[in-house]
Each structure stands twice: as structure tokens, then as C-alpha cells.
Amino acid sequence: MNYYLNQSQSFSKTITEYDIYTFAGISGDFNPIHVNREKAKDSIFSGQIAHGILVSSFISTVIGMYLPGPGTIYLKQTLNFRKPVYIGDTITASVSIKEIEENKKIAKLYTIVTNQNNLMVLDGEAVVKLP
């Protein structure tokens, strides 16, 4: 595949309670802010929120499946958590190519996740080895 600057791709998903509980089971992170409706209600978020790393995992979906795609190797990822993601939110993870080192087959990617209101919930940068 040919890659070029500003090439981009996205993936969308509506976050469910099942997603949060499944991620808690896999990760072992049962923080009440994620899994206890009553305790989360009294938090600064006023309700259950998705794990930040669960939200960021959809960046990996884009990188591994769409852009650059299968065969891509993650080398580095920075994440800035901007806003909480709630059950029922539809998030869109997007990746765009910002730099390409052709000779090393390395790309620097801008990564962002937005919610259904087009508000940024997470952003960062990834460095990958191209397939």
C-alpha cells in the first residue's frame, strides 16, 4: 500500500455497559468509577465512565486494521485524556499520517478520539513500523 501525508482513517463504536464490564474482567481494573453505578453517580463524573485505556484501544483498531493496517507494529503511543466517555456514547477513533520516514518504514501518526458531539475525548501521537 502507498502511504501519504494526511492520509486518514476512522472507526466508530457505541460504548455499552457490557464493553466496560468485559474490559474490567480482562484488565482487572474494577475501579468503582467504571463498574459501580451508585458510587459513580456520586463522583465528579456523575455516572459510570469507560476506562481510558478501553477508549484508546480503538486507536489500535484503526492502526492494526485500517491505517496503516495489518502488519503494522506499534513502537510508541502518547495519550492525553480530555473528557470522560459514558455508557451510550458513540466514539470515533481517527488516525492521520503526519510524517513518513520512507527509508526506515516508520510513520508518525496523529491520533484522536471524539464523541457523538464531535468533542475530543482523547488525543495523542503514535509511532509505527509500516508493514
Locations of the language-model features?
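HotDog/MaoC-like acyl-thioester-processing domains
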Residues: 1-8, 85-131
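Hot-dog-fold acyl-thioester-processing enzymes
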Residues: 1-72
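Generic detection of short hydrophobic beta-strand segments and adjacent strand-loop junctions
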Residues: 9-15, 79, 126-128
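Hydrophobic alpha-helical context, especially transmembrane and signal-peptide helices
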Residues: 37, 43, 48, 79, ...
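Mid-chain, well-packed structural core segment of small domains
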Residues: 65-93
